[in-house]
Regions:
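Terminal low-complexity/charged segments
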Residues: 1-155
Length: 155
């Protein structure tokens, strides 16, 4: 069984945590960016798996852990250090966070300088109007049905 471990870190502690994971042989899996619509801040989620430790755990009890580093409360203009010097495979994720969310990721090893995606609106994932938010919330509500189920099923 897979177990997920979430560790919240600050921007200042990100590189030291990544360096520690690299030191024990953890592999980078993915990075996910999202915007908090309530306060406008951003969150980054970095996922790693320590393959060596996972093999040992699976052999013992069938379990293994996915490790996640969570950086929350990021202001759009705050500088976020790239982890690409430790994990070069992060480059598409960091470029995506820059292009779609407008996040200021610094010192990327492979930096597309805003041209990783061709988008018609700059930073499209950072924009949400009150109308769009209301429409999303409305579409999430399930319609209620007053008709008894046996009539709907033809019983």
């Amino acid at each position: 069984m897979q177990k997920a471990i979430y560790t919240t870190v600050g921007i200042d502690g990100l590189l030291s945590h990544v360096q520690a994971l690299k030191g024990v042989g953890a592999r980078f899996v993915q990075m996910h960016a999202e915007r908090n619509v309530d306060d406008g801040t951003y969150r980054l989620l970095y996922t790693f798996i320590n393959v060596r430790a996972a093999r040992e755990q699976i052999a013992q009890d069938g379990n293994y852990a996915i490790e996640n580093l969570v950086v929350e409360g990021i202001d759009q203009h705050q500088e976020i250090p790239s982890i690409s010097s430790y994990y070069p495979a992060v480059f598409p994720f960091e470029n995506e966070a820059h292009d779609l969310f407008g996040l200021a990721i610094t010192d990327m090893q492979i930096d597309f300088k805003g041209f990783f995606y061709q988008v018609s609106t700059a930073e499209p994932m950072s924009v949400i109007t009150p109308e769009v938010k209301a429409a999303r919330e409305k579409s999430m509500k399930l319609p209620t049905c007053q008709t008894p189920a046996f009539l709907l099923l033809g019983v």
